[in-house]
Swiss-Prot record:
This is Gag-Pol polyprotein. Keywords: Aspartyl protease, Capsid protein, DNA integration, DNA recombination, DNA-binding, DNA-directed DNA polymerase, Endonuclease, Eukaryotic host gene expression shutoff by virus, Eukaryotic host translation shutoff by virus, Host cell membrane, Host cytoplasm, Host gene expression shutoff by virus, Host membrane, Host nucleus, Host-virus interaction, Hydrolase, Lipoprotein, Magnesium, Membrane, Metal-binding, Multifunctional enzyme, Myristate, Nuclease, Nucleotidyltransferase, Phosphoprotein, Protease, Repeat, RNA-binding, RNA-directed DNA polymerase, Transferase, Viral genome integration, Viral nucleoprotein, Viral penetration into host nucleus, Viral release from host cell, Virion, Virion maturation, Virus entry into host cell, Zinc, Zinc-finger. Residues 640-830 form the Reverse transcriptase domain. Residues 1379-1426 bind DNA. Residues 444-466 have a biased composition (Polar residues). SUPFAM superfamilies: Acid proteases, DNA-binding domain of retroviral integrase, DNA/RNA polymerases, N-terminal Zn binding domain of HIV integrase, Retroviral matrix proteins, Retrovirus capsid dimerization domain-like, Retrovirus capsid protein, N-terminal core domain, Retrovirus zinc finger-like domains. GO terms for cellular component: host cell; host cell cytoplasm; host cell nucleus; host cell plasma membrane; membrane; viral nucleocapsid. It comes from Simian immunodeficiency virus (isolate GB1). A motif (Tryptophan repeat motif) lies at residues 994-1010. Its cofactor is Mg(2+).
Length: 1441
């Protein structure tokens, strides 16, 4: 058996043909399998002679075996066949391919194991048994560098790096990384990952064995593994130890690969779950994207295999998903690609058809004409000349034939020219379909393009003003011509509504069939049960629903629609629906005119948040009437194309419900998108507020438009639509619920406002460029258009705007098109010369209205306050203070009822606002209302543009000037938003009162330019506090005391002239008695008075000069203070020796409370008077509380500071430094300050350059730890030298703003202090650099204070020491993890455990048991070590933890 060319001869071939292909199968190997095997070997560049010997077969397997697991089915079949041949050569008895694979696999693994044992490059053992190191070759380094330069950091870089560094040590790996050091960002990422892994290694291997005196190796640390603190010899020794060898090279390599995975992920931020196939994307392109992203995923091989088997199918588009699921779970990637090759857009299908045609033309096959006249001789397999498909002549093919084609022009169909010479413009070369005017009785022509009249042009989305009218004119003209009986050379279908499927009766060879007109189908196909055609046919396979379909192809079949027919190709097969494809409709002259142009609107891509999936919330029960109402709404929306049915595979759902419309019997559909909104990406609000009429420039012509069906006009991202799925249930579960999803922006979805605003704004930008002088305001779907055009020009601009919107199918309904005043817009009523607020009707309030009714009322009043002055809501808001339910009823007070009636009277008188005139000055005038609020109006001349009020009260006690300052800030912010600048402000007070208050309260942030208008009311309500004691005036020492238990209290005063008064009070507190004491002093004193108190509470209230309060006692004190000419208020601690304060303290304390006596306050005051010591010195030396020491300092007129600025937050971490340059004596001093401790380093530099700054930074980093550097954005700090030094040192560099205290406040303050120190010692120094060094020494080691009362030098050392102790303590705590805890709970006598010890205290322990944290008493637990020691020793060791 066999022939000379066979690899097996005689008996070997007989044995071969008895071996089964599969175990338990019937088919056996044949000679054809050997022939096929030889052909496959040629693909691998292997000779077929290798099959003739056993050694040759083993060589084949050495090449193919490593690819077996990941190889295709052909490769696995080839390996199996070679294994069978090898077993026959070796005389091994086998019965099937699986037996051969099993036996050959064992042999190959043994050989591989032997090879692995002998392969130890780059470490080689010499004859003496010593390990010799072979450095990595330059060729490998060159390959690595070239790969990084070409591939950057794509996923394929990682396996190449792993292959190039096989067996390398840490030294080699560092050489590889240094070779690509130009990639600084990537190297920094790798460095961070290596440092993290090294720290984790040190944490998990805390017991470091030092080097032994006898030459023993130390245990490698994390830095040793990274090769930074170890030598090549040590690395080799660790890798080749006899016992407990540590392969540092492999460990370090895994760290680097971990960092590379992070790099790859940063360069490929798309998650594998986000890779989804587009609706018209080719499956091959989708697979390429999928695998590129999957390579970047940090996952194991099993996980990636699961991704390939599940995610690849689940994320495909519905068409491919249905085909792939029909293939089953075991389908290979090749089978998937073959099955889905027909899925894609028109370009993909055209490319696929071209490739198929090229394949067919290139092959020598018989083409038999099975129906109709033959176009030429039958092509023979070989030895015949080619036939031209154009002229049917032999000797050439169609593409080399120069004569015109038989079918004429591809554009218009005329026979007298080609497409290149077609006179019609390129815009009309598109194939159009449904016409938009009705069709009369016309004669059928050969081609539709032969009609030459002007009406044959395609209706496109024009931007001209006549667009909307142009369509109706064409319709009317076409109808008139049709009625006139004018003949046309072309043929067109009538108009078909897309609210339902376009199905038409079709005659096919005399058989009538109802078929779907499908412009997306390439071919015409009918179900074999509906029609039987006669004649010859050809077999064909096409891609259909559920997979490939085997159909019969009939040529030259006559198809007739509405009396108009043509000949074409028809397919007959098992299709679920009969379809008329483009091949027939094109011959009939079908045109597709897109009356709905929403496909021109750009799609905004939307995604879910990373790591989440869509909502799956069940639909709750609905009543029958709601279900019926919802179904009607959904049917209408589906007809309009705004929603569509959902595939059965969609498992997302969002619940819906229905409510009745106001005063109607119709239902309104609502959908609960709360869960989907949580899962969806965040959107930025494009418009932060509504436009205001006061900011509109006065114009002659106004028009207000509204975009109809605003959200429903903008398409939703097709990839996101499945997440909006919802279900309309049926009553009693009579049938499965109908499932829909949104095709447009849904109401209630978080992204709808942002996407709608952005989409419409991009379209309106065209109009704004064409009409720069026109004011076009857009807020959601409301449009305001104002201009100074003439009436005709303005109307023309409006027509152009509406036509522009229509190009994107954004309609502006006539019923909301406002041409004449008054114009209703955004709640306002607009006129050409004025604007109003739409009439505000206040509802009648009952005696006990609900919280919700009060809230609505306050909202209406606040809306009206922008134009109606004097509106107050303070008393109404008091009714709903606290956490009340919106349905809870409240009782109207007399004040609230009065406020309500006053507001009603104000609203009864209509108010008008004016538009902004850029040529006139804009100013704001403030007034104080009787209710205490601040009202204001924006004015130009005598005209009011708008009004407002300010009643915000942050504290219980406030004054008018503080409230006035807050009002000016509010007005300034609103003015910038509306007009873009801050106008001049007229405040109702005098300059003296304002500056007197402002002197004490300068830190209230920003105040604009003001103009003072004296108002007697505000002057009368103001009172002055003197900063110094009044000479010759009686001094009142006041005090109060109360008993916490009995609530009894006393308050009184004693004067320096011997007068005294003490009153008793019931049910009072200590703070109230202090206030009563001040009140008594004000009642009995004259117009000028000195008051001394020991109450910080009283001073804190009265020092801010409040004029309004809800506190009854404070209110009385304010009224008494207004009647005084001058008041001096001071604070002194209530202790012995301080004036008459001690005496009044004894009077009011008698029988009330026990007075504490502190002897150190008086000496502290004396010391401060002598040396002006700071607070820290007083607290340290005299052991005073911080509050007392601070008050002693602030009571000194020389040390007192008027107010303190509002401070921000400064990063005071341990490693944070601030650096700045200052100038003194025409020289440059660079100053560095440690933010946390205040430690300073300074020196004189020759030039303020990046090089000198970098040198200073390096010297600083060599002495002190730095993790973060903060500077201003000066050129020396932003230079390349400083950035490089920060990168090398691993320092984070941040920038601030020069001279901004919030940016470099610490170093700016030190600059000033350093200069003061230098000034004191400058006379003792010859050179400035010596003075700088001495001043730095004094600051760091001779100035005590701040945190801990230490010097700056002591403080920074203490902080570093504390940080090290903390880290040591954390390490000690981690040792607790070595202990296990067994414990009992409650009355349960059974021991539970073991748990993990987290903390051990004196009476209890904290442990973790089964993911739960427990606190157990020490008497109910036993703690043992986790490793082998006796119970006794374990207990002893435990107590030492």
């Amino acid at each position: 058996m066999g022939n000379g060319n066979s690899a097996l001869l005689g008996t070997d071939l007989d044995k071969f043909e008895k071996i089964r292909l599969k175990r338990g199968g019937k088919k056996c190997y044949r000679l054809k399998h050997l022939c096929w095997c030889k052909g496959e070997l040629d693909r691998f560049g292997l000779s077929d002679k290798l099959l003739e010997t056993q050694q040759g077969c083993e060589k084949i397997l050495s090449v193919c075996w490593p690819l077996y697991d990941q190889g295709s089915d052909n490769l696995k079949a080839l390996v199996g066949t070679v294994c069978v041949v090898a077993c026959i050569h070796a005389g091994i008895e086998i019965k099937s391919t699986q037996d051969a694979l099993k036996k050959l696999k064992v042999i190959t693994r043994k050989e591989e194991k032997q090879e692995d044992e002998s392969k130890n490059f780059p470490v080689q053992r010499d004859a003496a048994g010593q390990y010799q190191y072979t450095p990595i070759s330059p060729r490998i380094i060159q390959t690595w560098v070239k790969t990084v330069e070409e591939k950057k950091w794509k996923p394929e870089v990682i396996p190449l790096f792993s292959a190039l560094t096989e067996g390398a040590i840490s030294h080699d790996l560092n050489i590889m990384l240094n070779a690509v050091g130009d990639h600084q960002g990537a190297m920094q990422v790798l460095k961070d990952v290596i440092n993290e892994q090294a720290a984790e290694w040190d944490l998990t291997h805390p017991q470091q064995q030092p080097a032994q005196p006898g030459g023993g190796l130390r245990t490698p640390s994390g830095s040793d593994i990274a090769g930074t603190t170890s030598t090549v010899e040590e690395q080799l020794a660790w890798m080749n130890m006899q016992q407990n060898a540590i392969n540092v090279g492999t460990i370090y390599k895994s760290w680097i690969i971990l960092g590379m995975n992070r790099l790859v992920k940063s360069h490929c931020p798309i998650s594998i779950t986000d890779v989804r196939q587009g609706p018209k994307e080719a499956f091959k392109d989708y697979v390429d994207r999928f695998y590129n992203v999957m390579r970047a995923e940090q996952a194991s091989g099993e996980v990636k295999m699961w991704m390939q088997q599940h995610l690849l199918i689940e994320n495909a588009n519905p068409e491919c998903k249905q085909i792939l699921r029909s293939l089953g779970k075991g389908a290979t990637l090749e089978e998937m690609l073959e099955a889905c090759q027909g899925v894609g857009g028109p370009q993909h299908k055209a490319r696929l058809m071209a490739e198929m045609m090229r394949t067919v033309v290139g092959q020598s096959q018989n083409f038999v004409q099975q129906r109709g006249p033959q176009r030429g001789p039958v092509r023979q397999p070989t030895g015949r000349k080619p036939i031209c498909f154009n002229c049917n002549k032999e000797g050439h093919v169609a593409r080399f034939f120069k004569a015109p084609r038989r079918k004429g022009c591809w554009n218009c169909g005329a026979m007298d020219h080609q497409k290149a010479q077609c006179p019609k413009p390129a815009q009309q070369q598109r194939v159009n379909f449904f016409r938009v005017w009705p069709l009369g009785s016309l004669q059928t022509g050969e081609l539709s393009g032969t009609r030459g009249d002007s009406n044959s042009s395609t209706i496109r989305g024009e931007t001209s003003a006549e667009n909307s009218e142009h369509l109706s004119e064409i319709r009317e003209r076409a109808q008139a011509e049709d009625e006139g009986g004018e003949e046309r050379g072309g043929f067109s279908f009538p108009e078909y509504s897309l609210s339902r499927r376009p199905i038409e009766e079709v005659s096919v060879d005399g058989v009538t069939i109802r078929a779907l007109l499908d412009t997306g189908a390439d071919d015409t196909i009918f179900n074999e049960r509906n029609i039987k055609l006669k004649g010859n046919w050809q077999p064909k396979i096409i891609g259909g629903i559920g997979g490939n379909l085997r159909v019969k192809q009939y040529d030259n079949v006559y198809v007739e629609i509405r009396g108009k027919g043509t000949f074409g190709t028809v397919l007959i097969g098992p299709t679920p629906i009969d379809i008329i494809g483009r091949n027939i409709m094109e011959k009939l002259g079908g045109k597709l005119i897109l009356a709905q142009l929403s496909d021109k609107i750009p799609i905004t891509k939307v995604k879910l948040k990373p790591g989440v999936d869509g909502p799956r919330i069940k639909q709750w029960p609905l009543s029958k009437e709601k279900i019926v109402g919802l179904q009607k709404i959904c049917d209408r929306l589906e007809e309009e194309g705004k929603i569509s049915r959902v595939d059965p595979g969609n498992n997302y759902n969002t619940p819906i419900f229905a409510i009745k419309k106001k005063d109607k019997n119709e239902w309104r559909k609502l959908i609960d998108f709360r869960e989907l909104n949580k899962l969806t990406q965040d959107f930025h609000e494009l418009q932060l507020g509504i436009p205001h009429p006061a900011g509109i420039k006065k114009c002659k012509r106004i028009t207000v438009l509204d975009i109809g069906d605003a959200y429903f006009s903008i398409p939703l991202d097709p990839d996101y639509r499945p997440y909006t799925a919802f279900t309309v249930p049926s009553v009693n579960n009579q049938a499965p619920g109908k499932r829909y999803m949104y095709n447009v922006l849904p109401q209630g979805w978080k992204g709808s406002p942002c996407i709608f605003q952005g989409t419409v704004a991009s379209l309106l930008e065209v109009f704004r460029k064409n009409h720069p002088t026109v004011q076009l305001y857009q807020y959601m779907d409301d449009l305001f258009v104002g201009s100074d055009y003439t009436a005709e020009e303005h109307e023309k601009a409006i027509v152009e705007l509406r036509a522009l919107l229509m190009t994107w199918n954004l309609e502006t309904p006539e019923k909301k098109y406002q041409k004449e005043p008054p114009f209703h817009w955004m709640g306002y009523e607009l006129h050409p010369d004025k604007w109003k607020i739409e009439k505000v009707q206040l509802p009648e309030l009952a005696e006990q209205p609900t919280v919700n009714e009060i809230q609505k009322l306050v909202g209406k009043l606040n809306w009206a306050a922008q134009l109606y002055p004097g509106i107050k809501t303070k008393q109404l808001c008091k009714l709903i203070r606290g956490g009340l339910n919106i349905t809870e009823k409240v009782t109207m007070t007399e004040e609230a009822r009065l406020e309500y009636e006053q507001n009603k009277e104000i609203l009864a008188e209509e108010q008008e606002g004016s538009y902004y005139d850029p040529n006139k000055e804009l100013y704001v005038r403030f007034q104080k209302t009787t209710g205490g609020d601040i009202s204001f109006q924006w004015k130009q001349g005598n005209k009011v543009l708008r009004a407002g009020k300010y009643g915000k009260q942050k504290t219980a006690h406030s004054n008018d000037l503080m409230k006035l300052a807050g009002a000016t800030q509010k007005v300034g912010r609103e003015s910038i938003v509306i007009w873009g600048f801050v106008p001049k402000m007229q405040i109702p007070t005098t300059r003296e009162i304002w500056e007197d208050w402002w002197h004490e309260y300068w830190q209230c942030t920003w105040i604009p330019e003001v103009e003072f208008i004296s108002t007697p009311m505000l002057e009368r309500e103001w009172y002055s506090l003197s900063p110094e004691p009044l000479e010759g005036v009686e001094t009142y020492y006041v005090d109060g005391a109360a008993n916490r238990d009995s609530k009894m209290g006393k308050a009184g005063y004693i004067t320096d002239r011997g007068f005294q008064r003490v009153e008793e009070y019931l049910n009072t507190t200590n703070q109230q008695t202090e206030l009563h004491a001040v009140k008594l002093a004000l009642e009995d004193s004259g117009s000028y008075v000195n008051i001394v108190t020991d109450s910080q509470y009283v001073v804190g209230i009265l020092a801010s000069r409040p004029t309004e309060t809800d506190h009854p006692i404070v209110k009385e004190i304010i009224e008494l203070m207004k009647g005084k000419e001058k008041i001096y208020l001071s604070w002194l601690p209530a202790h012995k020796g301080i004036g008459g304060n001690e005496q009044i303290d004894k009077l009011v304390s008698s029988g009330i409370r026990k007075v504490l006596f502190l002897q150190n306050i008086e000496p502290a005051q004396e010391e401060h008077e002598k040396y002006h010591s700071n607070e820290a010195q007083l607290r340290e030396k005299f052991h005073l509380p911080a509050l007392v020491a601070k008050q002693i300092v602030q009571s000194c007129s020389k040390c007192c500071h008027h107010g303190e600025p509002i401070k921000g937050q400064t990063d005071a971490s341990l490693g944070v430094w601030q650096i700045d340059c200052t100038h003194l004596e025409n020289q440059i001093i660079i100053v560095a300050v440690h933010v946390a401790s205040g430690f300073m380093k300074a020196e004189v530099i020759t030039a303020e350059t990046g090089k000198k700054t970098a040198e200073f930074l390096l010297k600083l980093a060599a002495q002190w730890p730095i993790s973060k550097l903060h500077t201003d954005n000066g050129p020396n700090f932003t230079s390349q030298e400083v950035e490089t030094m920060c990168w090398w040192l691993g320092i984070e560099h941040t920038f601030g703003i020069p001279y901004n205290p919030q940016s470099q406040g610490v170093v700016e303050n030190k600059n000033k202090y350093l200069k003061e120190l230098i000034e004191k010692i400058r006379e003792d120094c010859k050179e400035l650099k010596t003075a700088v060094a001495m001043a730095t020494f004094i600051h760091n080691f001779k100035q005590r204070g701040g945190l801990g009362g230490m010097t700056a030098g002591e403080r920074i050392v203490n902080m570093i020491n504390t940080e090290l102790e903390y880290q040591y303590q954390q390490n000690q705590i981690s040792k607790n993890l070595n202990f296990k805890v067994y414990f009992r709970e409650g009355r349960d006598q059974l021991w539970k455990g073991p748990g993990i010890l987290l903390w051990k205290g004196e009476g209890a322990v904290v442990l973790k048991y089964q993911e739960e944290i427990k606190i157990v008493p020490r008497r109910k637990c036993k703690i043992i070590k986790d490793y082998g020691e006796s119970g006794k020793n374990s207990q002893v060791n435990l107590e030492s933890v």
